[in-house]
Amino acid sequence: ELEYRLIRESKKYGSYVKGYSTTWKEIWKGLKKDDIAIEFCTYYSNNTEEYAAVLLEKKSKYPTVVRLFSQKQLSTIPTTDYYNTTALSNLIWKPLHHYLAEKKNVYFSPSGELNNIAIEYIPLTDKKTFAEYYNTYRLSSTRELIKNKREDIRTKAVLYGGLEYERGQGDIEAMRKELQSAESLIAFRDVPEIDSLVLRKGISFLEGTEREVQTIDTLLRNKQIPVALMSGMAGTEESFKQLSGQSITLLHVATHGFYSPLTGHYTAQRSFEEQALSRSGLFLSGAAASLNMKKIPEDIEDGILTAKELSKLDLSNLNLAILSACQTGLGEIVGDGVFGLQRGFKKAGAQTLLMSLWKVDDTATQLLMAEFYKNLVSGQNKRAAFLNAQKYLRSYQNGIYDKPEYWAAFIMLDGIH
């Protein structure tokens, strides 16, 4: 009965775009002999949350369901063991070993708590991670395999970084005048270097993000890619919302991300989603005033961009969004996915996301991002550019950043081309 229910539910995948549906047969037709598509899912049995995997491979004419483990079993593994032992692989990948034989490409869509774990980077053996044995692709849904892809990122780019989170009355008045007079807050021009940026009380200034976006700005401009660099007080929520409907293909946001777990019980799905999306977001220029409970004029945004607000934008031209911030991948976990920034961006229409799952080291992030963009502008596709940047970081200065805490935080979602 369980297998029948899971297979029946797998025939129609949910979509971030209303009215879009895909059958497993369409996905199956597009698979090659050495491909396997894995849709992880959760279900309840005897009041216990259980995990299973629905597998699609070319040699099987129907989906295969494999029961995996319970949430209770998962919770017994310390998070410190995730990327240093094979304990997690024994629950997730070992039961699928038979199906992975002779496979080269593994396309998987996580569910439940697996959204918050980089399961592609967990050790499969004492020497290698899962991703070192297979070409792994993390997907928001395996339906992504049959969607049309856009690989070109050269049209326009917008970079947010080195943001000032504090703002005084003068900043607010200046912003009001700019809003009244300017047609657009996004200008594709150079932005002067911001002086006297120091560590703040509350939301701390991320000094490394200023260097990060300046480096990326130079790399892109050298390749004749139009760039708008939003730093200091320029990286406002107003400017971000003006991206909606524009032909922006590359967006880089280097700032603080936030995630606040949802408390209480919500029976209505719509209410749950709205509440959960409101608890993930990004801090943009001027956000500290709102957090410090300062009064902000009604015609000025608070600088706190929630995933809910993000989801209502039109970012359908966005080929790649890079979220270089703390905990940007996190959100409220429910059965059909994660209600966080990744949900917000996908609902807005973004194709590929590169984001972090936990607080990231500033210097390591700068190194990884700079190398990623070097690879990208040299002609590598998104996935190759990312994987090679990880390898570079791990080998940097004789491996000072080789521990997973430095490089495994970043995941690429829907990075297929």
Specify the residue positions occupied by each region the protein language model found:
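Catalytic cores of enzymes
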Residues: 10-417
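Amphipathic alpha-helical coiled-coil segments
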Residues: 1-2, 9
